[in-house]
């Protein structure tokens, strides 16, 4: 893999570099979606989650969720099987074990038909989307993306990712680099688009918040 031509990166606030280094680390846990329903969650956290369940998601958030849902509803029947839900979560950088996936299905499947309809999917993830420590705004994600997209062509290559992570003090092994590209590159074209980057960053941020 050849090293990209050296260019002067666009100056960015130090916080953006810290956020990029943190958010771009591979996700390590999948307890994000179930932690605050467990008995170990504090009463204050549970009260916050209950209040947020009563708040509506914005149209943009619902649209994004519907797009994600449809992309994994392979037979277009308006519901996800356990296998499809597992694939969806893995595409977001989460790594559910079989037991964790079973727990999610049991919690979300309110009509007990063994499938997850869109309304059940929204009910599952809405509290995390509305949590007061929500992940980065689109503007913040765009700034992070621009740090890595060194040639400004709208895509992040493996070389750009490796170079930028090294400059941020997180040099990657070949295995780590390959793994990160594989996690984020959902369409398999060998590079990361802004949409893919946004999903990967959001998933990693949720994982850091709730782990």
From Swiss-Prot:
Positions that bind Ca(2+) 1: 73, 75, 77, 79, 84
Keywords: Calcium, Metal-binding, Repeat
GO CC annotation, single: cytoplasm
Database matches in InterPro entries: Ca-binding_regulatory (IPR051111), EF-hand-dom_pair (IPR011992), EF_Hand_1_Ca_BS (IPR018247), EF_hand_dom (IPR002048)
Record carries keyword DNA repair: no
Role, per record: Potential calcium sensor.
Protein name: Probable calcium-binding protein CML11
GN (gene name): CML11
